[in-house]
């Protein structure tokens, strides 16, 4: 699935002025390209809420080009929690590392016995050709008993998709009921949302 977003080249406009005008400054880049751009903040919010880092966003440029991209980094204003800068990675024919959503299906046998399914990862880092990017990877958890876990090596990957993480990475597990409260406490103690959603190519701006 892909989404479309109008983008404009920056020709000397200051980022602060663009933000005051409701625009979001950014950069589009790959190994052969590095160009400053901006997009409408409201339109970006609409598209990014759906596409996130998992789906292709096609930038429609004033010169008629339509470039397929993935969002690699979004910097947020610390006080208002709104985007200040975005990095778009421009896709080519070369394989790319990206996060693909996981879709869990089935009810684990262990859940029927009173256990709780712990979804440790909601997406997985893979290496894939842009033409083979899947919308999601289905994960069948119906066979998991209490105490069982499912690892990256257990995933049934679509053709042309390779793991970019350790095969031993735990994806999901069914835990005993008595562990649920402990897991909730651990989740509450986790670090708050990072300012940078995904690390990409940084740009220094005044």
UniProtKB/Swiss-Prot annotation:
The keyword Transcription regulation does not apply. GO terms for biological process: translation. Residues 195-206 have a biased composition (Basic and acidic residues). This is Large ribosomal subunit protein bL25. The keyword RNA-binding applies. It holds the Pfam family Ribosomal_L25p. Gene3D superfamilies: Ribosomal protein L25, beta domain, Ribosomal Protein L25, Chain P. One of its GO terms (molecular function) is structural constituent of ribosome. Keywords: Ribonucleoprotein, Ribosomal protein, RNA-binding, rRNA-binding. Part of the 50S ribosomal subunit; part of the 5S rRNA/L5/L18/L25 subcomplex. Contacts the 5S rRNA. Binds to the 5S rRNA independently of L5 and L18. SUPFAM superfamilies: Ribosomal protein L25-like. This is one of the proteins that binds to the 5S RNA in the ribosome where it forms part of the central protuberance. Belongs to the bacterial ribosomal protein bL25 family. CTC subfamily. GO terms for cellular component: cytosolic large ribosomal subunit. Residues 184-206 are annotated as: Disordered.
């Amino acid at each position: 699935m892909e989404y479309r977003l109008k983008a404009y080249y920056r020709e000397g406009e200051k980022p602060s002025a663009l933000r005051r005008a409701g625009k979001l400054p950014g950069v589009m880049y790959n190994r052969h390209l590095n160009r400053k751009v901006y997009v409408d903040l409201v339109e970006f919010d609409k598209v990014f809420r759906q596409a996130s880092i998992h789906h292709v966003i096609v930038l429609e440029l004033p010169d008629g080009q339509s470039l397929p991209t993935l969002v690699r980094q979004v910097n947020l204003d610390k006080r208002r929690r709104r985007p200040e800068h975005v990095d778009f990675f421009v896709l080519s024919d070369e394989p790319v590392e990206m996060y693909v959503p996981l879709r869990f299906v089935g009810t684990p046998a262990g859940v029927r016995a009173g256990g709780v399914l712990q979804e440790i990862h909601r997406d997985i880092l893979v290496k894939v050709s842009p033409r083979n990017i899947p919308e999601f990877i289905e994960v069948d958890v119906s066979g998991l008993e209490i105490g069982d876990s499912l690892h990256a090596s257990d995933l049934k990957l679509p053709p042309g998709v390779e793991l970019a993480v350790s095969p031993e990475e735990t994806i999901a597990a069914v835990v005993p009921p008595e562990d649920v409260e402990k897991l909730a406490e651990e989740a509450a103690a986790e670090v708050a949302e990072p300012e940078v959603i995904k690390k990409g190519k940084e740009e220094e701006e005044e």
